[in-house]
C-alpha cells in the first residue's frame, strides 16, 4: 500500500511539473504575441485553487491532474468586444499562432535540457560497461561476445557507461545488423561484433534491456560465504556461523551464491546436506529451510546474508561537468532522447517494435516512484525522459494535439485561408478516437504487466 501511495505521489508531482512547463510555454509566447490569456489551468474539473492577476488571467489548480490548458481570447469560441479583437488568438498571424502552439513542446525540450544540466553539474554515477557473464543461446552469445570484455561503442557511438549502452541499444531494436565494439577490460584493442535485433523483445518495466540480450553486467561479487546469520533462523539452528564458506549442497559443488539461494528457495522444509569450510576445517551440517509463502507459493528461507565484494573503483565512473560544459552535454543528451523517441514511435508504426511495448500511466507512475526512491538525480533524469516524450507526442499531427493545430496552420498558409470548421470538427473527432484507442492500448499493456 505504501509503495502505491509513493508511486502515486511521485507521479502526480512529475505530471504537475511537466504539465505546468508545457502550458507555460503556450502562455508565455501568447503573452509575448499580445494574445489575451483568460485562464491558465493545471488539471481538469473542479477548481481547488484559483487566483486572478492584474491582466485578467485566472490561474487554476483543478481536481483531476491529468492535463492542463491555456484558454486564450478567440472569436471562434465567443463574441469579443471590438476593442479586444486585436488581442484575440484567431486575429494573429499564422507565424504568431504557430509559435504559440509550438511553444508547449519546445518548453518540454528546454526543461529536459535544464534537468540534465542540473544532473551533470551534480554528477551522474555510473559503471563501465564490462560484461560479467553471457547467457548461452542468447542474442549476445550468437554474436560471440565474450565475458570480461567492455562495450566501447554501439554503431560508432561511444558508450562510457551502462546507461549509454542501454540508450543506444534500445534505439536499434528491430534492426538486423547492429555493430558493437568490444575490447578486453583496460585495453583499446577493439573488435566489432554484430547483433541481430530483429526478434529482440523485452518488457521495459520488468526487464533490463541489456539482460534481455543475454548480457549480465560485471557487478559486485557475491561469494558463497556467510557474513551474517540471523538469530533463531534455519541457518542458526543448523549451526551455520558468519565466515562459513559453503562448498557443497547435497553433494553438488557450489561456486555461486545464487545457486545456494535456488537450492534453499526450492526446498522449503526439506533437509539439505551442506559441506562447509570454517577457518580452514571441513564440516558437514544439515540445513532445513524455513517455509514462507511468496505470492501464494511455498518457498524456502535460510536467514543468512552473503559476503559481498564491492565493485573495484576502476569500474566506476562519474559524469560531472562545469556549468558551461554541462549545457552542451545536457543538450546532446536531450537530442539523443528525442531521436530515440521518434525512432521508437516510427518502429511502433511500422511494426518493427511490438505494440505491447507501449506504456501508459501505471507504468509511468511505477517509473516515477522507482526513480524517486533512487534519489534526486534519477528523478530528474526520469522527468527529462518523460518531458521529451510529452513534447514529441504533442507534435504528432493529430488534430487534438499541438501537431494537429500546426498542420492546420501549415495548410492555411499554403491555401491562403483557414481550414473550414466542418473539416476541423471532423478531424478532431477522428483524432480523439485514435487518441482514446491509443490510451486504451497503453492501459491494457499496463494492466497485463501487473
From Swiss-Prot:
Zn(2+) binds at residues 22, 26. GO terms for cellular component: plasma membrane. Keywords: Cell inner membrane, Cell membrane, Hydrolase, Membrane, Metal-binding, Metalloprotease, Protease, Repeat, Transmembrane, Transmembrane helix, Zinc. PANTHER family: MEMBRANE METALLOPROTEASE ARASP2, CHLOROPLASTIC-RELATED, REGULATOR OF SIGMA-E PROTEASE RSEP. The 2 circularly premutated PDZ domains act to negatively regulate protease action on intact RseA. Interacts with RseA. A site-2 regulated intramembrane protease (S2P) that cleaves the peptide bond between 'Ala-108' and 'Cys-109' in the transmembrane region of RseA. Part of a regulated intramembrane proteolysis (RIP) cascade. Acts on DegS-cleaved RseA to release the cytoplasmic domain of RseA. This provides the cell with sigma-E (RpoE) activity through the proteolysis of RseA. Belongs to the peptidase M50B family. This is Regulator of sigma E protease. It comes from Salmonella typhi. The gene is rseP.
